[in-house]
């Protein structure tokens, strides 16, 4: 369930005003309240629609479905809250408020584990889906930082199903930051969802690190931050992995595990090869793979 920015802002401010040193837990609890409030609001709207059904049986069925959906939504809120609190146990109590100084950015994205050189295209395949990621010459200024725009498109059986622009920048220490995305999901050529869109500096969104300059085993960090929309987390779980994909054999790969409180059961392992970048994604539950097939250019 995506919680509205206004509800989140009001509840986080209200809870924070009562004090407490643990900003992470305070945030998790406030978001849980916002999630439950939104679920109940949607339930009341559903009941209002049910009331306008003249047929008694249809009305009762509508009310029963609304109640079931409320129960499911509240359980989802609870599961997400537990996942956020588990993350807090590792992230610590401090507010998430990274200092972004534009003067500390400006060079090329040449981190050996995630080089994003304009003109480079990466082609991935997994099952019926293919993914083409192109590092463009376009730049976008966000929070005063000039970001590289990456165009990422996903096809399912040849049909375009997702079209995304991602924005990245590297600081002078070599960390690669993620500043947001403009994403569209499509069906039959029509946009059906823009869920997941966020831009650092807008509605409380903040950038996160997608690749550290010197990753260490056990590192646990935020990759993005917009409560209720973008909450990906990553943990470094391997430093010297070997990977075989259609694009070749790669040694010395970094392995990370990505999770998000928005989908508590989802876990994805990613492998990054020196000098190449992302070469493999593996669903930790199903074992399904998205593999690098080809690197073109620059």
Roles of regions detected by a PLM:
Residues 1-5:
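Positively charged n-region of N-terminal signal peptides that target proteins for export
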Residues 18-94:
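Soluble, non-transmembrane alpha-helical interaction regions
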Residues 64-298:
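Conserved functional acidic sites
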Residues 8-9, 297:
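A ubiquitous, low-specificity "background" feature that marks scattered single residues
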Residues 9-17:
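Hydrophobic h-region of N-terminal signal peptides that target proteins for export
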């Amino acid at each position: 369930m995506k919680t509205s920015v206004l509800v989140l802002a009001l509840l986080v401010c209200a809870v924070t005003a009562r004090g407490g040193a643990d900003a992470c837990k305070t945030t998790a609890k406030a978001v849980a309240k916002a999630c439950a409030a939104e679920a109940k609001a949607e339930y009341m709207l559903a009941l209002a629609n049910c009331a306008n059904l003249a047929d008694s049986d249809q009305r009762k069925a509508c009310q029963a479905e609304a109640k079931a959906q409320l129960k499911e939504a509240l359980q989802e809120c609870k599961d997400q809250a537990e996942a956020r609190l588990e993350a807090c146990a590792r992230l610590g109590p401090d507010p998430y408020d990274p200092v972004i100084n534009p003067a500390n950015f400006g060079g090329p994205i040449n981190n050996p584990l995630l080089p994003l050189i304009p003109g480079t295209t990466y082609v991935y395949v997994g099952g019926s889906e293919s993914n083409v990621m192109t590092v463009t010459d376009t730049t976008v200024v966000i929070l005063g930082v000039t970001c590289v725009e990456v165009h990422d498109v996903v096809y399912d059986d040849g049909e375009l199903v997702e079209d995304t622009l991602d924005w990245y920048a590297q600081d002078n220490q070599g960390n690669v930051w993620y500043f947001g995305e403009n994403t569209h999901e499509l069906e039959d050529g029509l946009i059906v969802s823009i869920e997941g869109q966020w831009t650092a500096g807008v509605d409380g969104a903040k950038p996160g690190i997608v690749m550290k300059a010197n990753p260490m085993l056990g590192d646990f960090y935020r990759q993005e931050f917009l409560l209720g929309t973008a909450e990906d987390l990553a943990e470094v779980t391997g430093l010297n992995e070997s990977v075989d994909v259609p694009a070749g054999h790669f040694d010395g790969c970094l392995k990370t595990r990505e999770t998000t409180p928005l989908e508590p059961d989802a876990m994805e392992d990613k492998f990054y090869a020196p000098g190449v970048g992302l070469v493999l994604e593996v669903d930790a539950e199903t074992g399904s793979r998205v593999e690098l097939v080809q690197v073109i250019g620059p």
